[in-house]
UniProtKB/Swiss-Prot annotation:
Entry keyword annotation includes Glycosyltransferase: yes
Sugar attachment sites: N536, N1228
Listed EC numbers: 2.4.1.-
Main location (coarse class): endoplasmic reticulum
Biological process terms in GO annotation: 'de novo' post-translational protein folding; endoplasmic reticulum mannose trimming; protein N-linked glycosylation via asparagine
Induction trigger: By tunicamycin and A23187. Induced 3-4 fold 10 hours after treatment.
Organism lineage string: Eukaryota, Metazoa, Chordata, Craniata, Vertebrata
InterPro entries documented for this protein: Glyco_transf_24, Nucleotide-diphossugar_trans, UDP-g_GGtrans, UGGT_TRXL_1, UGGT_TRXL_2, UGGT_TRXL_3, UGGT_TRXL_4
Modified residues (Phosphoserine): S1277
Protein name, UniProt field: UDP-glucose:glycoprotein glucosyltransferase 1
Encoding gene per record: UGGT1
Cofactor(s) demanded: Ca(2+); Mn(2+)
Amino acid sequence: MGCKGDASGACAAGALPVTGVCYKMGVLVVLTVLWLFSSVKADSKAITTSLTTKWFSTPLLLEASEFLAEDSQEKFWNFVEASQNIGSSDHDGTDYSYYHAILEAAFQFLSPLQQNLFKFCLSLRSYSATIQAFQQIAADEPPPEGCNSFFSVHGKKTCESDTLEALLLTASERPKPLLFKGDHRYPSSNPESPVVIFYSEIGSEEFSNFHRQLISKSNAGKINYVFRHYIFNPRKEPVYLSGYGVELAIKSTEYKAKDDTQVKGTEVNTTVIGENDPIDEVQGFLFGKLRDLHPDLEGQLKELRKHLVESTNEMAPLKVWQLQDLSFQTAARILASPVELALVVMKDLSQNFPTKARAITKTAVSSELRTEVEENQKYFKGTLGLQPGDSALFINGLHMDLDTQDIFSLFDVLRNEARVMEGLHRLGIEGLSLHNVLKLNIQPSEADYAVDIRSPAISWVNNLEVDSRYNSWPSSLQELLRPTFPGVIRQIRKNLHNMVFIVDPAHETTAELMNTAEMFLSNHIPLRIGFIFVVNDSEDVDGMQDAGVAVLRAYNYVAQEVDDYHAFQTLTHIYNKVRTGEKVKVEHVVSVLEKKYPYVEVNSILGIDSAYDRNRKEARGYYEQTGVGPLPVVLFNGMPFEREQLDPDELETITMHKILETTTFFQRAVYLGELPHDQDVVEYIMNQPNVVPRINSRILTAERDYLDLTASNNFFVDDYARFTILDSQGKTAAVANSMNYLTKKGMSSKEIYDDSFIRPVTFWIVGDFDSPSGRQLLYDAIKHQKSSNNVRISMINNPAKEISYENTQISRAIWAALQTQTSNAAKNFITKMAKEGAAEALAAGADIAEFSVGGMDFSLFKEVFESSKMDFILSHAVYCRDVLKLKKGQRAVISNGRIIGPLEDSELFNQDDFHLLENIILKTSGQKIKSHIQQLRVEEDVASDLVMKVDALLSAQPKGDPRIEYQFFEDRHSAIKLRPKEGETYFDVVAVVDPVTREAQRLAPLLLVLAQLINMNLRVFMNCQSKLSDMPLKSFYRYVLEPEISFTSDNSFAKGPIAKFLDMPQSPLFTLNLNTPESWMVESVRTPYDLDNIYLEEVDSVVAAEYELEYLLLEGHCYDITTGQPPRGLQFTLGTSANPVIVDTIVMANLGYFQLKANPGAWILRLRKGRSEDIYRIYSHDGTDSPPDADEVVIVLNNFKSKIIKVKVQKKADMVNEDLLSDGTSENESGFWDSFKWGFTGQKTEEVKQDKDDIINIFSVASGHLYERFLRIMMLSVLKNTKTPVKFWFLKNYLSPTFKEFIPYMANEYNFQYELVQYKWPRWLHQQTEKQRIIWGYKILFLDVLFPLVVDKFLFVDADQIVRTDLKELRDFNLDGAPYGYTPFCDSRREMDGYRFWKSGYWASHLAGRKYHISALYVVDLKKFRKIAAGDRLRGQYQGLSQDPNSLSNLDQDLPNNMIHQVPIKSLPQEWLWCETWCDDASKKRAKTIDLCNNPMTKEPKLEAAVRIVPEWQDYDQEIKQLQIRFQKEKETGALYKEKTKEPSREGPQKREEL
């Protein structure tokens, strides 16, 4: 029956389903097995890994409040009210009841799906970083002495209510504080009043008391109340993090690299190894299922499982033929298990693959599975760009990049999708329709809008189609299709490129723009250039008083007398007289006219009777009507350039770029026949869809606010008492319920159907219709509507004055007409009401009956109009204040739920704006949604409502990548399918995966957690590779992620999520790696074991590895706006106002990339004092948290996600020719590095000024206890032989806690300085996955950014080297202008010739007779290295070569040797590095350093080689061991450092950990 009755009683999972005969047999076998193996007793070994924060635990209650704040501030404050009593004392005192009290309070505001996400979020501790950021901001204040909570009023602090009053009185004398996006502003706060920032812990009694006082002040309009979390007395324990992976990789033991020093294990809490952590499937037995079926046999099952695990765990190598089909066989094994367990099996097989592989080789693969996978792979490649073996994950069609997206950004996607799906569900759109609507791509278009340039107001200087200057150019558009070299600008006699300068002639920037225009014309650039001069257009201002008018009239005079081209030449003469930065004056104009036209009376041109005012009024009219923004403006084919592009150099570059870009557009149009030869080109350009009559930045801005229109209720605005108690969404629903609409054909309302047309655009006009500005807005909207059948209009009243019957006449009349009249009558009547005459007549006492229109039922109207019920206006006023956030009387337009406003009092918003608004809605969303809603067959008025509500919901989504339409792949034989629960909203999740890849190790546990969080329609397609030639997975893996917080049996929080490797094989050598989100820097903090070489046979029970999140990374890209290039060598610092410089960094030339190590909080980014600050200034910044025009760049890190900013810098005017990396780099004279050095006590030492050359910088890297032991011996050998002071630099990333703890003691003993440097491998640089190769990368790829600029030169010495000479000699060695010097490989040991790979093949031809150098010892001249951008060149070459897994096999050595032609190497004399493998014995006596190279012939272990080759090695080793024993004793007795009072003979041991 497919069951192999072998000794172990296994039953292959691939053989048959979980239930049935196999299990009956299996259970019978149990007793036999137990009898056979009852005497076997083997303790199982385990490895656990945890990751905690450096900061203290943050209360879950506070984290919960931040989850709700992300939804809305309203929910945040409601939750604060609901959770007043959940201090940690008010419930029965257990963690469990505290947690459930939080859930109970929060669940009132959350749907069931959101409740699951909320629990997951608390388990992830997502918002711990947010609370910690507030803690850091509070610490920066700092808090006043002895206050548990405190107030900060414009910088002054107190925790006394009385003092608060006094501080409020004087607040206006002090500047307002900078508020952050994450601050919590109380809804009724008055932004004009003094800001009170309240720091406290919600849930505490003190908070409640102060909070009530502040609310009453806020409601009275006296303060702007802002709340920030502050925990006076945090729990002194860290936060356990999750959302990371732990890899246990099997190391090659070809060369033995284990230290033989015995390690004492530490006590480990054995509850860490949980009872219920079984790997579900062992040799075909699904133990979880067995335990459910046979609870009575639990003890025996446990023993059986243990035996089976131990019998399978030892790994025997597989033959090549057994490897070939492993991917398909693993897929077959997964797909044969019951569907509900398939993900569990996939997780188990991929995460424990090395021990599962042998059993998997016995699995048969069906031809159906193989064929279906191969068929699907054609689609995967064609539609998704996936190769066999690649992985991908899609959630509702959104691509989740598994390499770059961490669990925190994935959580954001889930939460956002949930919001939209639940919104659509509430609107009655469900199932497949919901997913179809979701897939609509309705992002606001990125197209740049253009205005029409076919206006007589433009004075065109030239015309390419008629001017004789261009006669020699070809005039056919076919020329566009003629091939040319890239970047060549084609000269064709067509006005393809039109540039309009809209300027105020008297402004100081105009001269520069004139010069640019002149440059374009004189260089025959194919541009038609026009001007619009915007000047004072009042008739009594003439050109003898006003320079602007003078320029305009001078231009017009010459244009009429000669032509526009000469008129422009005259202007250039005028502006040439103006000094840079000054304005043109009337006398400049007069002197040029007198000189060029001496026979004309200047006064007749410029004076009061001038006839040369052409376009004076029209120009201003065009400028105002097009709404293009503040002057000067430059239009290219009608599209305005951005402000920063108007800098003269920038404008030149960007224009050339635009010409090339639009040429491509025209080529396509000509090729497709859209632009025939005889068509006017300008007409063609102006008929493009992005051309609008007016550009209104309010409408086109990317910052958009939307109403939430998804709620539904049966309330209306005419019940004011009920309306006031609704929440924001409820109020919006009531307003929408109460709307009656005007439309072009008439009015369609719930009762009256004289129209069957879905209108995709809905405008709500908000204003005080009893004031002229409100009526004007309404009138313009109605006028626009006359030309459009897509629009419906309704009104919201926002009265400016206190509401009374008398002052709301027109508002009441409009309301009454909407309530009582037919569509046409209402529209005609309201149009009359909106005209100014009506209001004046009514105010003068006219009867409303005079305005009656045909078809109106006046008596019905009058009844409602004269009713004293004012509820609708009261409700509208409250709605405007609380939801729309408008002041009394302010106007706004709400278009399909998008709030445009508040409009300024004098701001124009006319028909053209409504036209633009309608255009945009129809193009991006309206039409698409309308066609979907039509398919739902709902009644017309409801349908128009639905379009509006769906549009608001979808458009409010953050802009992201479009959803991918995946074809329906075949899923009968090759996919895991989990169906969603019926009748509930579900996520559509598609995964493509090869089950024997690193991605599968991460994806399987992630999908298992998702399955517990969300209802999903899941399909996991197998994407197997065939013909494998190598073991596909050589590591065990655990992904740390839990769907909910867990508790211990006594109702306390369990000790955080941890990774557990149970039942591991004991023979292999493992290395442990953490796989964390990109922006995390973690370090190993506590473990006595060597995590680089874990050998379980020598371990007592558990290897517990503890890591700490040391930093969150702030990354950025920086460009010089003038050159568009990264400012190589520019330095930034990051700090706080109290401590301005905490870390600093250098900008790379690659992508202008920089990174800074930070932690949660608010930080200030500055240019580093010295050359960076002298030469540059920060021009603009993006992705930061301070306003663009603020002096300081503030960055708030308040979550665990990546933060990437963009900074543009500009050279100061007097520094344009200075070079950052030029030789005067005394960057450091009194800079940061000095201030950051300190002695052992942590106090700053007085800086003993040392000449730079007086110190030798030695860099080294090590990982694992053996290499750290070698490293200490190398250091000792250097110190014994070198007389000059030494400073060691170590790469911190991979040092063990033991080494980091001992090194200060050793530094004190031997009187040297040291520094730990670190750098996170940038995400854009090809990643290495193997630890050894990553370390090699650090030896060569980041040398320019790893060290501060003060370090001019350093020596790299490998950890396993012994130095026998004074290294000053090497430091001073002349490199003859090369950036670095390496020693070539020895040639003298002849018997090794067969291993010298550089003597043949690629290397022999590439080196062309040069030497191949060894990377164990080198010297780098950093000044030269940076100057020739060696680092950037090395990274560039690495990026290209490293994509090929077969290149750079010795990365740190092959790369510099490969780059020998671009980055020259100076060959050091041979005696600088002797190594027994390659050098003969005779040369050993001359050796200045001895390296313990691996020997590929003998494979001798390093330790044995060291003792045999280097006589002094054992003495050094003993000396260090004695020091370690002494250190350990002092540590245990607490005497560490106490007696170390002797004065160091030279500048003492110094340490600065951060770079």
